[in-house]
UniProtKB/Swiss-Prot annotation:
Subunit structure: Part of the inner core of the multimeric pyruvate dehydrogenase complex that is composed of about 48 DLAT and 12 PDHX molecules. This core binds multiple copies of pyruvate dehydrogenase (subunits PDH1A and PDHB, E1), dihydrolipoamide acetyltransferase (DLAT, E2) and lipoamide dehydrogenase (DLD, E3). Interacts with SIRT4. Interacts with DLD.
Stated consequence of mutating N190K: Moderately decreased interaction with DLD
Keywords: Acetylation, Lipoyl, Mitochondrion, Phosphoprotein, Transit peptide
Organism: Homo sapiens
Boundaries of every Peripheral subunit-binding (PSBD) domain copy: 183-220
Protein name, entry field: Pyruvate dehydrogenase protein X component, mitochondrial
Length: 501
């Protein structure tokens, strides 16, 4: 044995004898021989029972964003039995923000795909695959017993014919004189009791079958003309008395409600009274959750201002002559970043206990995609030039629409901008994206005639290109006065592009 250590041996055989994976064999073999071992040594690689084969490396569903709770396996990029190296792309995972590639962290062979591609709603930490060391029998690898199966997942299935819609039809019942079939308004009940009339002798015309005061007055008129007579209730059949429950004893008289067909029922598309369920993606569910939380927990305040784009459009035309293509939205991003630098009190967030001033100026730009609204980030926007901002917006927008955004490209941000001007919207209000404190909603620029004065003081009409911007702010950290001053400074910066240099 001493000679074998001195003369050397097959590294793979050495690994099998000691019981450690090859990539970790150097440090761990030293520990087995009594040499110093760092505290970070991973002792899970000792195998007392399977000393001729190492345990497989588990591939777990990772957390790829702060808000991610589950993910979908879009596609496996490696097949079972295929060799992988650290850094190789294993599969594509759809998170709550984008489709992200999961890379291998170890060398070896992909032995088993536990969760097939197309599986959805896989919880974080669930086992999705196994990797074994090179040279091991990957075909007979077993799923570790200490890892249970992942929670139920929804896999793509063949469309099944929807059941025929079932519509409830009121069943005609024999009416017992003296009983009420309608819900009565208080005024109608008083009139009927006063004149000893029964609502069943008339017709309910109120919404959802309510017998109204007007319906009761019609019955009184019919009684006065002799067309109907007083209603005398027929004694109900004798029933064995039972002790009423406390709830029944305190409850007032109840009247049966009219049977109303359901507004919609699951069924075949285009059928009357049916609907089609639309599966929600992870992105759509997270957007719905976060927007609901924002509107219900963040006190929104709004401030609006009109900005003259005359100078911006002139600068933009000059840049086009030099083959520099930038949009009005790029100027808006730059103006917002410069204003945040001038007013750091607005560059804040709410962390649950109090305000927190942010040391960076990262602008989140809303981008519409097929899967929902995403907000890639223009980092350090105040230090970037207009052309740099334009290039960043184009690149990030394309990645967002292709579902290729990296987590660091959409996580964070200190201020958001949402522009619907390209859709012909004049103005709107946007929902704050927590923990950010503000979002700026931008409408389209439109021609407006304004009365101005020339150099000689003569009044004249001039056409101006105006846009309306509305800032939604978190009143807990940005009050109305601060929001107003911010918009005033933003307007001045945008209307004078030289300030953005």
């Amino acid at each position: 044995m001493a000679a074998s250590w001195r003369l050397g041996c097959d590294p793979r055989l050495l690994r099998y004898l000691v019981g450690f994976p090859g990539r970790r064999s150097v440090g761990l073999v030293k520990g087995a021989l009594g040499w110093s071992v760092s505290r970070g040594a991973n002792w899970r690689w000792f195998h007392s029972t399977q000393w001729l084969r190492g345990d497989p490396i588990k591939i777990l569903m990772p957390s790829l964003s702060p808000t991610m709770e589950e993910g979908n396996i879009v596609k496996w990029l490696k097949k079972e039995g295929e060799a992988v190296s650290a850094g190789d792309a294993l599969c594509e995972i759809e998170t709550d923000k984008a489709v992200v590639t999961l890379d291998a962290s170890d060398d070896g062979i992909l032995a088993k795909i536990v969760v097939e591609e197309g599986s959805k709603n896989i919880r974080l930490g669930s086992l999705i695959g196994l990797i074994v060391e090179e040279g091991e029998d990957w075909k007979h690898v077993e799923i570790p017993k200490d890892v249970g199966p992942p929670p139920p997942v929804s896999k793509p299935s063949e469309p099944r014919p929807s059941p025929e819609p079932q519509i409830s039809i009121p069943v005609k019942k024999e009416h017992i004189p003296g009983t009420l079939r309608f819900r009565l308004s208080p005024a109608a009940r008083n009139i009927l009791e006063k004149h000893s009339l029964d609502a069943s002798q008339g017709t309910a015309t109120g919404p959802r079958g309510i017998f109204t005061k007007e319906d009761a007055l019609k019955l009184v008129q019919l009684k006065q003309t002799g067309k109907i007579t007083e209603s005398r209730p027929t004694p109900a059949p004798t029933a064995t008395p039972t002790a009423p429950s406390p709830l029944q004893a305190t409850a007032g008289p109840s009247y049966p409600r009219p049977v109303i067909p359901p507004v919609s029922t699951p069924g075949q598309p285009n059928a009357v009274g049916t609907f089609t369920e639309i599966p929600a993606s992870n992105i759509r569910r997270v957007i719905a959750k976060r927007l609901t939380e924002s509107k219900s927990t963040v006190p929104h305040a709004y401030a609006t201002a009109d900005c003259d784009l005359g100078a911006v459009l002139k600068v933009r035309q000059d840049l086009v002559k030099d083959d520099i293509k930038v949009s009005v939205n790029d100027f808006i991003i730059k103006a917002a970043a410069v204003t945040l630098k001038q007013m750091p009190d607005v560059n804040v967030s709410w962390d649950g206990e109090g305000p927190k001033q942010l040391p960076f100026i990262d602008i989140s730009v809303a981008v519409a995609t097929d899967k929902g609204l995403l907000t890639p980030i223009i980092k350090d926007a105040a230090a970037k030039g207009i052309q740099e901002i334009a290039d960043s917006v184009k690149a990030l927008s394309k990645k967002a629409r292709d579902g290729k955004l990296l987590p660091e490209e959409y996580q964070g941000g200190s201020f958001s901008i949402s522009n619907l001007g390209m859709f012909g919207i004049d103005e709107f209000t946007a929902v704050i994206n927590p923990p950010q404190a503000c979002i700026l909603a931008v409408g389209r620029f439109r021609p407006v005639l304004k009365l101005t004065e020339d150099e000689e003081g003569n009044a004249k009409l001039q056409q101006r290109q105006l846009i309306t911007v509305t800032m939604s702010s978190d009143s807990r950290v940005v009050d109305d006065e601060l929001a107003t001053r911010f918009l005033k400074s933003f307007k001045a910066n945008l209307e004078n592009p030289i300030r953005l240099a």
